[in-house]
């Protein structure tokens, strides 16, 4: 092997790294910004919770205020129940763990009409992935614990 080959290989690897890093958005903070989320199914595998959450860094390191809108969508087994809720939350990151504690701000929509208008706040304990593009862990409320997944809400460039 000639001395130039290792340099060429290193240059190729460096070039690929630069191209890939340019394709990924830069996040000044591990958590701040917009994320989408969903949970595993529940209620006889008929319902699921999903939503969009925005984290804003506070003056306290690794602490965030957050707001989100969640939707609980159920199928026929649960009378096609649909609940859309606005929630407020605080989040704290310790290492890779992120704990999100929420409170229901307002129930925005319930279908079918006449269904119960109560909703339990969606709380989460998740772990930030090493690429800072995803968080996985648990959703919990007073009735259940579910798997939860968060991913960055990044618009694709077309």
Task: Locate the predicted segments by residue.
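N-terminal secretory signal peptides that target proteins for export/translocation
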Residues: 1-7
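N-terminal helix-cap/turn-to-beta initiation motif at the start of protein domains
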Residues: 25-36, 55-59, 127, 156-157
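Bacterial N-terminal signal peptides
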Residues: 11-22
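Beta-turn initiation residues at beta-strand->coil junctions
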Residues: 39-40, 69-70, 102-105, 138-142
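N-terminal glycine/threonine-rich, aromatic-flanked beta-hairpin/loop signature
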Residues: 46-93, 137-141
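Contiguous, well-ordered beta-strand patches that form the walls/edges
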Residues: 69-130
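A charged, solvent-exposed segment within the mature domains of Sec-exported extracytoplasmic proteins
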Residues: 120-158
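Short, hydrophobic/aromatic-rich segments at coil-to-beta transitions
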Residues: 29-36, 61-67, 96-101, 133-136
């Amino acid at each position: 092997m000639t001395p130039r080959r290792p340099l060429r290989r290193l240059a190729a690897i460096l070039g690929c790294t630069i191209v890939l890093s340019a394709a990924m958005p830069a996040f000044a903070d591990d958590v701040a910004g917009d994320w989408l989320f969903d949970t595993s199914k529940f209620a006889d595998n008929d319902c699921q919770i999903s939503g969009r959450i925005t984290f804003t860094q506070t003056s306290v390191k690794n602490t965030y205020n957050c707001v989100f809108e969640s939707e609980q969508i159920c199928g026929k087994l649960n009378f096609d129940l649909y609940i859309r809720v606005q929630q407020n939350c605080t989040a704290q990151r310790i290492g890779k763990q992120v704990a999100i504690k929420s409170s229901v701000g307002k129930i925005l929509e319930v279908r079918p009409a006449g269904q119960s208008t109560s909703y339990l706040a969606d709380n989460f304990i998740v772990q930030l992935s090493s690429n800072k593009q995803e968080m996985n862990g648990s959703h919990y409320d007073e009735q259940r614990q579910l798997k939860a997944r968060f991913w960055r809400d990044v618009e694709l460039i077309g």
